[in-house]
Amino acid sequence: MRYKIIFCFILFFSTQNIYSSDSISRKIDRNFYKFLAVEGVVLTGAISYLKNEWYSDKKRVPFHFYNDLKGWNQIDKLGHFYAAYLESTVGYSLMKKFNFSENQALYLGGSQGLILETPIEFFDAYYEGWGFSVSDMVANTLGSVFFIAQQKYFGEQVIMPKLSFSRSRYARTAYGLLGKNNLLSEFVYDYNGYTYWFSFSPKNVFRINKLPDWLNLALGYGADGMLGEFE
């Protein structure tokens, strides 16, 4: 399943003083509706994009599964993991800004990667050439869990997933299958240019105070020579 681009709209609301438990409750109720509104905008934008970009030339078919575990040498799975992680990060940050409790922000906000990606996976299941991918769902789940676990046990994100992209030579000879010879199109279609990283400070991860603050390590994974999902 190709990597889904999710549009994240971050709204900023001004804070105000709260003087009673009743006002706190009312504010949280209002903020919950604001949060749902933001989530609705994100999901609507994502599905609209996919419908126009991915499904416009595809035939609608009955619900079916699709096994793409080996597709794109697992770069796509890392893409799902990374997208879910980012969505969970934004969800948690929004709920904290809306004055939800730490547990509410952690478990509801931190689950946004899985919550937002799941409807899209079901949407895939009804189009020819796509399908419901169990491995995508596993990757989505792991992305959210990775955020929640770090926030729960470290109080911060000590291992940061990151993405780098550079244009590959394959897109120019793939007859449009890997993009239309421009940066944005190739970023969407050409997995040869992707490298996913796990970046961390050994001092923060291993709690060794003698290590310098500036020391940072990163482990990356990319793939090369791919002209199609299984080629």
Identify the meaning behind each predicted range.
Residues 4-14:
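Sec-dependent N-terminal signal peptides
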Residues 16-20:
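Sec/Tat signal peptide C-region and signal peptidase I cleavage site
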